[in-house]
A protein has these predicted regions:
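A glycine-rich (often HGG/GG-containing) alpha/beta subdomain
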Residues: 1-145, 149, 153, 329
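C-terminal-of-GTPase-core extension/linker across diverse P-loop GTPases
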Residues: 2-12, 141-263, 280, 311-454
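Switch I (G2) and immediately adjacent beta-strands of P-loop GTPase domains
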Residues: 52-63, 68-72, 252-280, 298
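Short glycine-/small-residue-rich Rossmann-like dinucleotide-binding loops
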Residues: 240, 275-276, 300, 307, ...
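Short, Asp-centered acidic motifs that coordinate Mg2+ and/or phosphate
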Residues: 269, 301, 329
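Generic enzyme active-site microenvironment
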Residues: 271, 305, 331
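Inter-motif core of Ras-like GTPase G domains
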Residues: 285-309
């Protein structure tokens, strides 16, 4: 019998309520040892999906009011008996409730152990389990919606669609090879190729959406660059909504890289405000300039900032050169001041140019549109199932490669046995993706990344 586990399921700190979750064969028994229902009823007598108001106690001493929620196996999150004790939020009370249930016989839950048990009891596959962590950590609406699509089985259904095609092709060829004396209709190579192409198209679609999905869910490594005093730090502060970077009229104020994460439209940008690009004799500032140039080369997205109220300088011209071949948006700042004749030259160097005023807080919406367009995610659909991480991508890529090998073998006139080797390998990769054939080491590695209590 698996041990009954318990953990705090809500964030640590002061809040309206705090929840201690128990799961396992003894969950109700252990919760009953610390919970006193106000109506005198016993948790062990309650059916699933039942709540009782009462108090929690250590020994004979009650220390808080509480609500107990009882879920019976298999109709619970984990597939086991589950009890959730909701007490008033606060470090002391919630921790005391956890200590009481541990003293009554529960074992501390490990990271992700509740969701791991849900997976092991068939309540969800690995793609759905991984989406739980993605939903919790989502930093934007698109990321949350995408995670919910996976949690609702969207990705699993896509994978199962490809698997069904592969299994049907494999079964047909295996029957033809294994039972040559039976009256099995002769297989048509063109029909087999069409089926394999359908599976290949499904996998290719998932792989094609991976990079954009990562941009929407994991965020975009973004650097703000420009010569001194064009308003880089002011732009950073305007986007973050707080004085993250120091803004002064003194050139060289920003000397190191300042980093923050912000929402821009549906995207999450991991912003880095850098030192102004210029020649300087100041050793410390020069280090900052070199770091800015390095970040520009590494970043997925460049926000190149120019002062729209002054003529272009050699430093501006150099920035235009540095941005060639990069995914970049030109931000012409200080739109609140009389404009200088710089727009035409900037537009010749950049596909996307946004007029901005960090002082008056205008241009943010236009910047969001330009950034989404530059990254190719302007038509991102969170309802379209996505591969959520590198593990899933590798499994899908392996399956796609094996299907391609099967197609080549079939077109090359190889035996059905030989073709089936590649098809079976593709199926194994997809079954590993969903967890049906994942190794214990892979499963453990996935769930150890979860927070305790989930």
């Amino acid at each position: 019998m698996a041990k009954t586990i318990a953990a705090i399921a809500t964030p640590h700190g002061v809040g309206g309520i705090g929840v201690v979750r128990l799961s396992g064969d003894r969950a109700v028994e252990i919760a009953q040892a610390v919970f006193r229902a106000a109506d005198g009823s016993r948790l062990s007598d309650l059916p699933g999906y039942t709540a009782r108001f009462g108090s929690v106690a250590q020994g004979d001493k009650a220390f808080d009011q509480a609500v107990a929620l009882v879920f019976r196996a298999p109709r619970s999150y984990t597939g086991e008996d589950v009890v959730e004790l909701s007490v008033h939020g606060g470090l002391v009370t919630v921790e005391r409730t956890l200590q009481a249930v541990l003293a009554a016989g529960a074992a501390p839950a490990g990271p992700g152990e509740f969701t791991k048990r849900a997976f092991l009891h068939g309540k969800m596959d690995l793609t759905e389990a991984e989406s739980v962590a993605d939903l919790i950590s989502a930093s934007g609406q698109a990321a949350a919606d995408s995670a919910y699509t996976a949690l609702s089985g969207g990705l699993r259904q896509k994978i199962e669609g490809a698997l069904d095609i592969l299994m049907e092709v494999s079964a047909g060829m295996a029957a033809w090879v294994d039972y040559p004396d039976e009256e099995i209709p002769e297989l048509d190579s063109n029909t087999l190729l069409e089926s394999l192409q359908q599976a290949q198209d499904l996998l290719s679609h998932l792989l094609a959406g991976y990079d954009n999905g990562q941009l929407m869910t994991a965020g975009v490594d973004t650097v703000i660059v420009g010569r001194p005093n064009v308003g880089k730090s002011a732009l950073m502060n305007d986007l973050t909504g707080q004085e993250t970077s120091i803004v002064t009229a003194v050139q060289g104020t920003t000397r190191d890289v300042v980093e923050r994460t912000v929402r821009l439209g549906d995207l999450t940008l991991r912003l880095a405000d850098t030192a102004g690009l210029r020649q300087t004799d100041d050793v410390v500032e020069q280090i900052g300039v070199e770091r800015a140039q390095a970040r520009l080369q590494q970043a997925r997205l460049v926000l190149a900032v120019f002062d729209g109220s002054t003529p272009l300088t050699p430093a501006d011209e150099e920035l235009m050169t540095l941005c060639k071949g990069k995914t970049a948006v030109a931000v012409v700042n200080k739109n609140d001041l009389p404009p200088a004749a710089v727009q035409e030259k900037i537009r010749a160097a950049f596909d996307r140019v946004v007029a901005y005023s960090a002082k008056n807080h205008t241009g943010r919406d236009d910047l969001a549109v330009a950034v989404a367009d530059a990254l190719g995610v302007q038509n991102f659909d969170a309802a379209d199932p996505l591969l959520a991480n590198e593990r899933q991508r590798q499994c899908c890529q392996t399956a796609a490669d094996c299907v391609a090998e099967a197609v080549a073998a079939l077109e090359g006139g190889m035996t059905y046995d030989a073709v089936n080797v590649s098809i079976d390998a593709a199926a194994d990769a997809l079954l590993s993706l969903t967890g049906a054939r994942a190794t214990q080491a892979v499963v453990d590695r996935i769930f150890e990344k979860f927070c305790v209590g989930k």
